[in-house]
Amino acid sequence: MATAEMEKTTTFDEAEKVKLNANEADDEVEEGEIVEETDDTTSYLSKEIATKHPLEHSWTFWFDNPVAKSKQAAWGSSLRNVYTFSTVEDFWGAYNNIHHPSKLVVGADLHCFKHKIEPKWEDPVCANGGTWKMSFSKGKSDTSWLYTLLAMIGHQFDHEDEICGAVVSVRGKGEKISLWTKNAANETAQVSIGKQWKQFLDYSDSVGFIFHDDAKRLDRNAKNRYTV
């Protein structure tokens, strides 16, 4: 599904607005009287439900609470499942009600992964993968985060099956967006994903790809295996 189409799609919130407007247009009623929905309102709402646009996959938003992280011994134990969506309309409903990166507190991580894939190195789907990573000045990642989400859920990558999900990490000096993939050793697929991601975001700086295995062994000393 093209990004432009997704941006133009009516959200489910608008159906509720139509319902409210229809009721307001009715003649004035006595206090306590029940106002029945008109046929037009019911028909509109039915059409809205029937015309939702399904996505290729279901996706889940996860949130890693920085306060909880400081109190937990095990990495990932502070991860919380926020919301799972499977249609364009439900994505916008969730996105519009979740803080954008610039509004998150320092230390927070917001993830969006294919449903049933947890944003952890230990997840079986992620175990042999790696990450592409982009850096942004403080408060400047909102648009790139949205475009990353649209590219993922809109099936825009040629090697879409390689995509696990993405995470935006808010830190004191700025924000980072990481794109997680399945098979780090598949250089052709990873390089293609990295190049397309830069193109979707119109990102001019170089971006690097780190294997999860390297990150686990070497931590901050892990080096990029691929660069685009």
UniProtKB/Swiss-Prot annotation:
Impact when changing D213H: In allele pvr2(11), haplotype H1
GO cellular component, one term: nucleus
Keyword tags: Cytoplasm, Disulfide bond, Host-virus interaction, Initiation factor, Nucleus, Plant defense, Protein biosynthesis, RNA-binding, Translation regulation
Impact upon substituting E160G: In allele pvr2(18), haplotype J1
Domain of life: Eukaryota
Pfam families in UniProt: IF4E
UniProt PTM: According to the redox status, the Cys-126-Cys-164 disulfide bridge may have a role in regulating protein function by affecting its ability to bind capped mRNA.
Cellular localization per UniProt: Nucleus; Cytoplasm
UniProt record, GO biological process: defense response to virus; regulation of translation; translational initiation
Effect of G107R: In allele pvr1, haplotype I1. In allele pvr2(8). In allele pvr2(10), haplotype D1
Chain intervals with Basic and acidic residues compositional bias: 1-19
Biased composition, class Acidic residues, residue ranges: 24-33
Effect of N65D: In allele pvr2(13), haplotype N1. In allele pvr2(14), haplotype O1. In allele pvr2(11), haplotype H1. In allele pvr2(12), haplotype K1. In haplotype Sh
Effect of A74D: In allele pvr2(13), haplotype N1. In haplotype Sh
Ranges for region EIF4G-binding: 53-56, 63-99, 147-156
Substitution effect: D109N: In strain: Florida VR2; CDP06188; Dempsey and Chay Angolano; alleles pvr1-2 and pvr2(2)
Listed result of changing S77I: In allele pvr2(22), haplotype Q1
GO molecular function terms noted in the UniProt entry: RNA 7-methylguanosine cap binding; RNA binding; translation initiation factor activity
Subunit structure: EIF4F is a multi-subunit complex, the composition of which varies with external and internal environmental conditions. It is composed of at least EIF4A, EIF4E and EIF4G. EIF4E is also known to interact with other partners. In higher plants two isoforms of EIF4F have been identified, named isoform EIF4F and isoform EIF(iso)4F. Isoform EIF4F has subunits p220 and p26, whereas isoform EIF(iso)4F has subunits p82 and p28.
Functional description taken from the UniProt entry: Component of the protein complex eIF4F, which is involved in the recognition of the mRNA cap, ATP-dependent unwinding of 5'-terminal secondary structure and recruitment of mRNA to the ribosome. Recognizes and binds the 7-methylguanosine-containing mRNA cap during an early step in the initiation of protein synthesis and facilitates ribosome binding by inducing the unwinding of the mRNAs secondary structures. Key component of recessive resistance to potyviruses. (Microbial infection) Susceptibility host factor required for viral infection (e.g. potato virus Y (PVY) and tobacco etch virus (TEV)) by recruiting viral RNAs to the host ribosomal complex via an interaction with viral genome-linked protein (VPg).
PANTHER family: EUKARYOTIC TRANSLATION INITIATION FACTOR 4E RELATED, EUKARYOTIC TRANSLATION INITIATION FACTOR 4E-1
More info: Displayed sequence is allele pvr2(+), haplotype B1 found in strains cv. Doux Long des Landes, cv. Yolo Wonder, cv. Flambeau, cv. PI187331, cv. Cuba 3, cv. Bousso 1, cv. Pimiento Morron, cv. H3, cv. Lamu, cv. Bastidon, cv. CDP04928 and cv. Antibois which confers sensitivity to potato virus Y (PVY) strains LYE84 and SON41 and to tobacco etch virus (TEV) strains HAT and CAA10. The allele pvr2(2) correlates with resistance to pepper veinal mottle virus (PVMV), especially when associated with the pvr6 allele of eIF(iso)4E. Plants harboring specific haplotypes couples for eIF4E/eIF(iso)4E are resistant or tolerant to potyvirus such as potato virus Y (PVY).
Family: Belongs to the eukaryotic initiation factor 4E family.
Protein name according to UniProt: Eukaryotic translation initiation factor 4E-1
Organism name: Capsicum annuum (Capsicum pepper)
